[in-house]
Regions:
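Hydrophobic/aromatic ligand-binding patch that stacks against planar heteroaromatic rings
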Residues: 14, 116, 148-149
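Conserved active-site and cofactor/substrate-binding residues in soluble primary-metabolism enzymes
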Residues: 6, 10, 35, 55, ...
Length: 196
């Protein structure tokens, strides 16, 4: 099905901001939003990092320190889906999902396998994923990552996942409160019971 673009777009925007050398790989037609790519390019230029786009996983994995393979639907499909939802066109949504499944089936070789991991820096890049992942042989017949690769990285993956609730809570707080630091300090000073 058509998965959202939030992870690849967030990663290229954020990691270039930290000065990392970021390589985005995707099959033809699976573009992300052009505005986000521009942000990644500007961030890389400002921080001394780099951003480039390639059309093969091999090119992205070669010498990588970290890999974050994640499937997503093309931006154009997300735009189409939005219009269909706005129109209340359930038949159109169902047809689009079938079309996306057929399109995805053409790229089943885009998986994080043991062979692909051998291409990374010393064959030991850190594997990350936002979870849940489509795990070949475990959660689906042909997924984003081989079971053996996923199993090897369980601890860092679960650590990564454990931060999500706090990040989400922080984002909510920052969007709702003008001065989040003062608000948290006031909560801490007013509490008789320490929560942390």
């Amino acid at each position: 099905y058509g998965k959202p673009l939030s992870v690849p777009q967030g990663v290229i925007g954020l990691m270039t901001r930290f000065g990392m050398d970021v390589v985005l790989a995707h099959p033809e037609g699976y573009d992300v939003m052009p505005e986000v790519e521009e942000i990644a390019k500007k961030n890389a230029a400002a921080t001394g990092g780099s951003y480039k786009k390639v059309s093969t996983m091999e090119d992205a994995f070669d010498g990588a320190d970290i890999v974050y393979p994640k499937s997503w639907a093309p931006f154009a499909a997300m735009e189409q889906r939005t219009k269909l939802y706005q129109a209340g066109d359930q038949a159109g949504i169902d047809a689009l999902e079938k079309q996306l499944l057929a399109q995805n089936a053409q790229h089943k070789d885009w998986t994080c396998s043991e062979e692909m991991m051998k291409r990374t820096k010393n064959g030991k890049a850190l594997y990350l994923h936002c979870l849940p992942a489509d795990i070949t042989g475990l959660s689906c017949p042909e997924g984003e990552v081989d079971n053996s690769v996923f199993d090897r990285y369980l601890v860092p993956l679960y650590k990564e996942a454990s931060y999500k609730p706090y990040i989400i809570a922080a984002m909510i707080l920052m969007s709702k409160v003008k001065d989040p630091v003062s608000a948290l300090m006031a909560l801490d000073q007013g509490s008789k019971r320490k929560l942390f």
